[in-house]
Amino acid sequence: MHRFRKNTCLISDYFHSTGGNYNLSQPCVNIGMVGHVDHGKTTLVRALSGVWTDTHSEEVKRGISIRLGYADSPFMKCPKCPEPQCYTVEKTCPNCGEKTEEHRTVSFVDAPGHETLMATMLSGAAIMDGAVLVIAANEDCPQPQTKEHLMALDIIGIKNIVIVQNKIDLVSREKIIENYHQIKEFVKGTVAENAPVIPISAQQNINIDILIDALETQIPTPSHKVDKPASMLIARSFDINKPGASIEEIRGGVIGGTLTEGVLHPGDELEIRPGIKVTTEGSTRWIPILTTVSSIYAGATKVDEATPGGLLAVGTYLDPTLTKGDSLTGQMAGVPGTLPETRHQFVMELHLLDRVVGVTREEKINEIKTSEPLMLNIGTATTVGVVTSARKNEAQVALKRPISAAIGAMVAISRRVDSRWRLIGVGVIKS
């Protein structure tokens, strides 16, 4: 079998680092950008990182995020200026001209805000350590996906939240204050009730220093289990080869995501589960993939060791046809023999919401019924499960596409409401 070449810095075209000429340390925290469509999430990521994460051709054409976007950025600190003016993403302080020092590097996960892309948002939320809820000051609050995204953060258990009141340059002071009170009323009684509300303009770079100060306070670097076997949630996968490349030039497939525990090095063996679907004589099964790490990138920086926190691009010796077009998204990678089992069905304990959010009429949520199809998000995986048995607080589902998940894993549950998948609750895998 042909052993594909090691990957080069072409990997960094897919997991971006800041537009400045920095030598970044590995990101230590993943921060999600969530909120309603066109409220400025991608523009804010660009203001903080210099990277425009909408690079897919359809995203450029339609002007909205479709896939998860990623960008790394350093939070720099001026040794002379007081807080919050000391914070910037520049190498020199915009206030006094002093050379700044790197405080920490973060990864941003830019989730789409369109209602039809809720599954993508939920898979991104699985790798977030905290989140920025972006709310436009020039529209009434809350908008439908503002409500749905906040409910998703609450259900998944993301408690470290900063609220950004964006586009303050487009409205009057009176409208900003009115919108602020709408925001505070909206988050009352939710996981974001005590989150700070930072008024900014991502387009004009207004109050970015105050926002970074809030992110430093509200979303600390989490502690990670580096003494465990390496385990990685795959959020993207790529074929980085250009059309027409000769066999000698072909490079192995790339997986992108975040380490949840353990340490990863070039040369380490990896198992990927559930793996690839194989059909023989009318019988279908999923076979785990085994490969070796050829290179690791944190943004554009090649590293010899990767630890949990932040986003990584991992080069492998896999046939790139296995990784092209996000085909391994939702799978798990880790030390062979240590990953959770592949599940074609499971029983989950149910915790349903009272009402459907994100729709015009917030209807009461009825109990889950046998034979009902549900969209299920487990980690970065999205699959459809058909309910094979249902009781008041428990349901068994048969999956259209298997997942690798442990007992106790959390499941975000959505059902079809008015031809759209709507979040209705959360489950916990029991068996």
Swiss-Prot record:
Please list the GO terms describing molecular function. Answer: GTP binding; GTPase activity; metal ion binding; translation elongation factor activity; translation initiation factor activity; tRNA binding
Q: Which cofactor does it need?
A: Mg(2+)
Q: Where does Mg(2+) 2 bind?
A: D38, G63
Under the heading Pfam families, the entry gives: eIF2_C, GTP_EFTU
Gene Ontology cellular-component terms listed = cytosol
Q: Which reaction does it catalyse?
A: GTP + H2O = GDP + phosphate + H(+)
Chain positions covered by the region annotation G2? 63-67
Task: Name one process (GO BP) from the record.
Answer: formation of translation preinitiation complex
Which segments carry the region annotation G5? 201-203
Residue ranges, annotated region (G3)? 110-113
**Matching CDD domains, A to Z?**
eIF2_gamma, eIF2_gamma_II, eIF2_gamma_III
Q: Where is this region: G1?
A: 35-42
Q: Which UniProt keywords apply?
A: GTP-binding, Hydrolase, Initiation factor, Magnesium, Metal-binding, Nucleotide-binding, Protein biosynthesis, Zinc
Q: Which InterPro entries match?
A: eIF2G, eIF2g_C, eIF2g_dom_2, eIF2g_GTP-bd, P-loop_NTPase, Small_GTP-bd, T_Tr_GTP-bd_dom, TIF2_gsu
Q: Which residues bind GTP?
A: D38, H39, G40, K41, T42, T43, N166, K167, I168, D169, S201, A202, Q203
According to the record, the residues making up region (G4) are 166-169
Task: Name the source's superkingdom.
Answer: Archaea
Q: Could you say which EC number(s) this protein's record lists?
A: 3.6.5.3
Which positions, given as ranges, span the membrane?
none
According to its UniProt entry, the function of this protein is described as:
eIF-2 functions in the early steps of protein synthesis by forming a ternary complex with GTP and initiator tRNA.
Q: How does it assemble?
A: Heterotrimer composed of an alpha, a beta and a gamma chain.
Write down what this protein is called.
Translation initiation factor 2 subunit gamma
Q: Which organism is it from?
A: Methanosarcina mazei (strain ATCC BAA-159 / DSM 3647 / Goe1 / Go1 / JCM 11833 / OCM 88)
Lineage summary: Archaea, Methanobacteriati, Methanobacteriota, Stenosarchaea group, Methanomicrobia
